[in-house]
Curated annotation (Swiss-Prot):
This is Homeobox protein cut-like ceh-44. Keywords: Coiled coil, DNA-binding, Homeobox, Nucleus, Repeat, Transcription, Transcription regulation. Belongs to the CUT homeobox family. GO terms for molecular function: DNA-binding transcription factor activity, RNA polymerase II-specific; RNA polymerase II transcription regulatory region sequence-specific DNA binding. Asn-1149 may participate in regulating DNA-binding activity by promoting homo- and heterodimerization. It is found in: Nucleus. GO terms for cellular component: nucleus. GO terms for biological process: cell differentiation; regulation of transcription by RNA polymerase II. Residues 1069-1100 are annotated as: Disordered. CDD domains: homeodomain. The keyword Transcription regulation applies. SUPFAM superfamilies: Homeodomain-like, lambda repressor-like DNA-binding domains.
Amino acid sequence: MEIVSRAWESVDWDRIQTRVEAEVTALGQRQDDSEIRKTRLVEESNAYRGRTNKDSRKVAIPLIKAFQSEFDGLLARSTAAENALIDICKSIVSLPDPKSLLKGAEAWKNDAEKTQKAVEEREELKRQLIKVNNELEDLRGKDVKVRKLKDKLAKLESEQDIFIENAVNEVEKKAEQELNDRLTELIAEKEKMKEQNEILEKNMDSLESKNKDIQRKLEIAKQTVEQKDGLENEQLSIAMKDLADAKHKIVFLEERVSQLENEAEKVNESKKAGNIEDIAALGSVLVQKDDVIQQLTNDIKRHEASHVEELAKWKLAVSAVEKKNKTLIGELNELKNQLESRNDYEAIKNELRLLREIEFGDSAEANAESIERLGETVETLDRLLAEKNRRLQNENASLRVANDGFKGDEVMKAIVSGSHSRVVETVGKRVGAEEANSYRQKNTDSELIEKIQEAKRNKAVCELKFEDPTINVLTYLKNQKAKEAGKRDAPTPILAAPVTPKHVTKLGTHTITTTALPPRTQTAETTQSILQRLSNGSNKHLLNEDLKLSTVLNLKRFSGNPAKPLEAKTSEEQKAELETIEKMQKRIQVNVQALNGHPLNTTEIASHCKRLMIAYNIGQRLFAKHVMNQVVKSQGSLSELLSKPRHWNKLTDKGREAFRRIYGWISDDEAINLLCSLSPRRVWPADQNIEHPKAETLLDTSDPMEFKEEPVIRYDVTPKVEPVIEKIKSPVESPCSSQAGASSLRASRWRHDDISKEKILSILQTELKKIEEETTESKVVVPVKPTATGGNRRFSSNSTYESSSLTGKSRPSTVELILKQRISTGLQPLTQAQYDAYTVLDTDFLVKQIKEFLTMNSISQRQFGEYILGLSQGSVSDLLARPKTWAQLTQKGREPFIRMQLFMDDVEASEENDEKQPKITICDEDSDLAKTLATLLNAVHREPSEPKTSVKLEPLSEIDVIMQVPSASKPSSVVKSIDESSGEEILDTFEIVYQVKGILEENGISPRVFGDEYLHCTSSMCADLMIRTKSFENSKASEKLMYTRMKTFLSDPIAIPLLVEKEESKETVKAKIESVPAPREAPRPVKRKHSSDTDDYDLNTKKPIQRTVITDYQKDTLRFVFVNEQHPSNELCEQISLKLDMSLRTVQNWFHNHRTRSKAREKEGKVYSDALPNGTAVKSLTWKDDLQKMLDEAPAITSQWAPDYQNRAGSVKSSTSADSPTNNNYSSPIFSFDKASTTSTVKKPSSTGKLDNLVARMIRLAEGREAAAAKAS
């Protein structure tokens, strides 16, 4: 004690405190100097970044790293000085304190008193231990009882299983016996069942549905039994586990008791030793042990109560299982009775299968071969019969129409009767060789003439190869006869005219060809007889002779482009093809540059492009390869682009470039010719002129300031009927017609050359079907067919195609209304009632029904999945391609099928409501189609001078029709009713919002401007009214006022121009602000900048949609994952999106796209290097650890380019300079000292602070330094 007191008295406290305060002051001064220097370094780095580019900064990186190493050395020196001060303070603190010894003396007295109390508590613990031992003996006895109960339960379960098996076996034996008896009776009654086949076909559907219900019940019963068995096994396993846990706890208690006994003995020994400190520690231990014993006692009691409850539950479960078995036995009996009543199902099924095979062939049986060939499962018999009946009715109606058209037509009478050779000669005499030659194919005629002249020069006409498919047999023989007649007599008028052979005659979509000569085995007599038949024009039995002639000559039909063996292209052909492609690309590029950034009418361009590709038989793959020039790489992308063209203002840069290239092709006749020369299927109707659009009609000239009246839409079916009438008309009916009419009739003479009766009837039937479909289904006007000029194959259109919205009277279809409702309400979660309503569904039938529905209504899988199922396109495709059975699906897997069934129920209910309403049909019956067409044609011929307004619209998909809004709608259509009591109008809020949205979108007006300027409400309230629309009755007073203003807006013609001006002025101001050069512009690595050509457009056009751009580091990380795992899990995708600051959908789409491209490259035998880091595939077993490191480093790398200085616990941030206007234009500094830390910055202490506070602050400072160093390492 004396030594300690002397040591404390010799300490000079004033000197030590003065020294510590001086050191702290120096530390604060050094810290301030360091902050000033770092601030200056940050400013200099920002200035350096603004003055230099990336390349020059790369050169300066070594210098920056040298500065960093010097900075680290200075920090180390500063840390050493601070550690010295801390050591001094610690040495002061480590001096012994004499006060603690004095306080310890008082504590010893208290410990002695506690020791006496501990002895008394030890005696009490002994008594408690005796009680615990007694309770343990009781627990051992209860364990034996539990084992007996478990054995009894096992015995009861085995007996129950044996009873169930015996009952099932008996039922099966009885069912088999009854089925065998019934089969013998069915064999005897087979002949009677054939007579009742018609009745059974009508009842087949009901039998199949009942059979499916029985199968579903059997599956449900089987599932319930399996679930019960599984539940019982699970409960038994839980009970066994609980018993085992109780046993382990008992063993554990025994061990604990033995430990307590040992500790008690040690306590006794320590008492004898008389160590005061051990006695104090033992007291605390005993208190803890007492608590543990009390807790164990409570656990044992609780387990005993739980065991009693479990035994009661098991008894109830056993009784429930017995009851369930009784019910199952009853259900089995019912099923047995139902099977007895349906035992003739197999015989009926076999008979119907035989009927299907006889009537419908391969489509009757659903085997693997037929499914692979047909691509779908077998259709039901009623559907097949209905299709056959419909097909026969259409054929019958077409034949009646053709028969009516043939009456009074001399040419068609001659063709039907078979004497078409006389028709050919008669028309040839009347028309003349000059007019006929003008409608021939010049190339074909010249080729044939050259071949004939070559044969004459070789003097081997008789030895000509008759197998040559390019020579017309009849024309050749006529020429031979004319030559012989010319030698004997003067040339006749008919044979004097040079009748050159026609190579191929085309009619519509069919190719009418001549036949080839037989091999050179015919005798001279046979040839002479053939010539005599051809020259005899007055023979009455010309048809029979022609048939005999075709038999003798063994006539064969061949195509206009005969199939030739595939030969490798020569170098000259490849060079010519490359020159053609280069020439076409140059013309397209010139046409694109001539646009000068002008917006295009995408709908018209897509329509004309599809029409020209179909007319010239150009494949989409060839078009995408040579015309799109890598803008659209795949056939599917081109099909999507043409089938659903988006508005020009909604297209990305890539989409606009695609439509520019399409424009450059369809607006240039030479480019079209060049692509046709590249097409391997160069086949088009040579006798028809194909219309090319003018370049002016493809430009987007719409102006939101102009509001034109809606043109009257007329259903002009003349262009579709005209080709059929040209084929049916006779040249005798209109002898005084104009030159154009005569030309068309003379052209039809060559189209009908060598056409059989069956071919003409089939062509007429096909054309009439097309007219019927387009007349009954289309809601848009077909463009008027312009007149042909001369013999040109192509010409430019003289009529412009203007888009027109549907009239107010034409309402959307049932499917459109349902989809519109689903889009407005969104995807609602399923209720329990809906789950209960569809406990079992036939997934195969439902998927087939959905496929047919989507195909019939032109709904894409993406739209169906997004608005109906809430799934992606890939998930919908998997569901529809490979549906699982209902029993194999989980609760989550059944949800999409339930949504499909609910959707189909809504469609059926809406269709039933529509059937109750009166309908307006164009043709009541198929037989009235010809009369309707004739009436329309007569009206057209009577008023040839009446101007027509023809508007061509692209066929819209269901979603496009929903989103399309009429430009003018009547306000009265948005009023549902009028309240009689108050006289208030009850408005149709959904219709009002639907129309207002369409008008705003059509004119490019934002909801913010609409709400501020017209509704006089906030933008949030306007958006809420648009998105979450309520009914008028459930709306508030303020909301009703807004809906009333919207209704007024629909009938206010002045409001739209005013809002457009506001929108334009707003965009103009914004454009001026953006055009001002900012001193410092923040980089935007995530979003793509606006297109460069948008500055050339008007300000009222909408801005292009910005698309997500992936940075290089994000790409490298995604490629690294793709190499090691092409199908990452959702958790991994979420982690990647979180660390790389990307959306989850972007990450998933990236992997999906690269998987698809990788598979395509693998099919081609190539390696997909785009998804490989540095072009090489390096897999690693520890790729997950490497990925984690990359993700951890991602924020530091993506946010800055320079190395990150690790500073101390405080944060040094550079503030914005005075000349920077906003924080958005602030550029991050090169040197960043931001570091997340929870420690506080050291402040200067006051000179009057106490020594303890100073020491505590120094210790916190040291801890902060250590934490920063640990994070940096």
